[in-house]
Structures are given as C-alpha cells and as structure tokens.
C-alpha cells in the first residue's frame, strides 16, 4: 500500500475552482442541514447496502442526493484520482481521448485529461452512463474546466470503437454492474487493450470480499497490468470538510485500489 500526503499545486487549484462553483450551485436551494442529511443517506446506500440491488437511478432520485453526489462524492473521487495520476504517472500517457465508463459527473476523467500529455490540447472526453442527470452534470464539469466532450446514454458495457491513444477509465462504477454485464465488460476491455487502449479501473477498498475483483486482477496481470492499493491525505476545502464531519464520516485519508493496464510495448 502506498501512502502520500498531497500538497497544494496547480491541478488542485483547478479542483478548488470546480468544487466552489459546484458547491455554490447546489447549495442555492439546499441548506447545510439538508445537504448533510442527503450525504448521509447516499453514503448509506453506497456503503452499507452494496449487496442489495437497487433500481436504476434510485440512488440519485432526489435533489438532495444529486447535490451530495455532485459535491461531496465527486470531490473525493477527483482527489483520489489526482493522487493516482501522480503515483501511476498517468500524466505521461499521450492521449487523444478518454472514455469514462459509468462517468457520473465526469470528474475523474476530467482530472486525468487536465494533466495528460497531448500535442493538440487536453484529451477529448466521452462519458457513458445510464443516468441522464449524471451526463448533464458531466457536460457542466467539462465546460467549466475548458474540456471538450460528448456523452452517451447507454450501458457502460457498450463503448465506442477504440483507436490508438485512447484511454478507458472506469472509476467507482464496475462494482455497480450485475455479474453478467460485468463479465461482458471485461471481455470488451480485453479487446480494447489488444487495439491499443490504456485501461484504468478504480474502486473503493472493500470491507468484505468482492469475488469479481480477484478474477479481474488475475486477468489484468496476465496481460501485463498491475494491481495496487492506495491511500492519501487530501487537503479538503472547508465546506467539504465540514459536510464530511457533520455527516459522521472521516475522509482525512482516502483509500482506493486500481487495476492498470498500459498498451502493449509500453513500459
């Protein structure tokens, strides 16, 4: 397990600007108490009820839960992704396009695009999700950050034809799939790798065994990839820290695990 304290830098200033804009936008119609309660409810759904299937869109059915996801959850996802960009040296990837599967608000792909190597400006974004609100929010994220991208309302199992210098990112989304579609996704990712794609799978560190993860890790490593567990100590904006504490949560240390597969011939 790798641990690193995160310091202020130019990339996090972009994070700070995005967070403030998003937080201000969503708290125009919500009080601090309402956002705190929504964050607790959403946390309960994602953390304590992962073993129970939920109807599509159930987690984001209310304005409060959408606000919590767009501000609190997305902020922590960005901060973890920024740590991975440093540790896995993802900024060295020469990318034309980042395809984010189950993109949510698009922050993880955006964090990567802002720092990835490109001769023609930041990598273009393609976000795939089954939630219309999430796709709309992803577009807002990208526009605010000066990124270009398009969204597709479909299952994350179905992604566009892969070309050279494409990256496929699945951040906190593979675990949400049923077993059948998840197996199909892995087959499609293997094909994408053979076509030259960079692949990154990011998930929370599980409190209990997750059978699919071990199987995926074995196959990714057989293809030359790596499996890692990470933790970092992020610098939290004050509103985020206050919401986190009031919700009875403690994200002073973020933890995640990854499967990372570079194109053949890349070291």
Name these PLM-found stretches.
Residues 2-55:
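N-terminal auxiliary segments of SAM/dcSAM-dependent transferases
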Residues 57-84:
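Class I SAM-dependent methyltransferase Rossmann-like catalytic core
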Residues 105-120:
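Conserved SAM-binding loop of SAM-dependent methyltransferases across substrates and taxa
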Residues 131:
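Conserved SAM/SAH-binding beta-strand->alpha-helix loop
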Residues 166-180:
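A short SAM/SAH-binding and catalytic strip from SAM-dependent methyltransferases
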Residues 183-195:
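A short glycine-rich, Lys/Arg-flanked "PGG" loop and its adjoining helix->strand segment in the class I
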Residues 195-204:
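Conserved beta-strand signature within the Rossmann-like core of class I S-adenosyl-L-methionine
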Residues 223-267:
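Class I S-adenosyl-L-methionine
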């Amino acid at each position: 397990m790798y641990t690193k304290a995160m310091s202020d830098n130019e990339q996090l200033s972009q994070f700070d600007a995005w967070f403030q804009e998003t937080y201000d936008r969503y708290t125009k119609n919500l009080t601090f108490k309402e956002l705190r309660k929504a964050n607790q409810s959403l946390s309960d759904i994602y953390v304590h009820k992962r073993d129970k299937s939920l109807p599509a869109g159930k987690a984001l059915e209310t304005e409060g839960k959408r606000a919590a996801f767009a501000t609190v959850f997305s902020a922590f996802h960005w901060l973890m992704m920024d740590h991975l960009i440093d540790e896995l040296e993802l900024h060295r990837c020469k990318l034309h396009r980042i395809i984010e599967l189950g993109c949510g608000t698009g922050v993880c792909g955006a964090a990567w695009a802002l720092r990835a190597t490109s001769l023609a400006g930041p990598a273009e974004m393609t976000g795939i999700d089954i939630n219309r609100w999430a796709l709309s929010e992803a577009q807002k994220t990208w526009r605010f950050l000066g990124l270009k991208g398009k969204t597709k309302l479909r299952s994350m199992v179905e992604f566009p034809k892969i070309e050279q210098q494409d990256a496929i990112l699945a951040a906190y989304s593979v675990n949400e799939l049923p077993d059948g579609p998840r197996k199909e996704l892995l087959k499609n990712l293997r094909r994408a790798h053979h076509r030259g794609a960079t692949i990154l799978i990011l998930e929370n560190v599980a409190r209990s065994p997750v059978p699919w993860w071990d199987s995926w890790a074995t196959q990714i490593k057989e293809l030359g990839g790596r499996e890692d567990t990470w933790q970092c100590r992020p610098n939290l904006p004050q509103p985020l820290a206050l919401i986190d504490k009031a919700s009875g949560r403690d994200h002073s240390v973020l933890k995640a695990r990854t499967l990372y597969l570079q194109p053949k011939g890349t070291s």
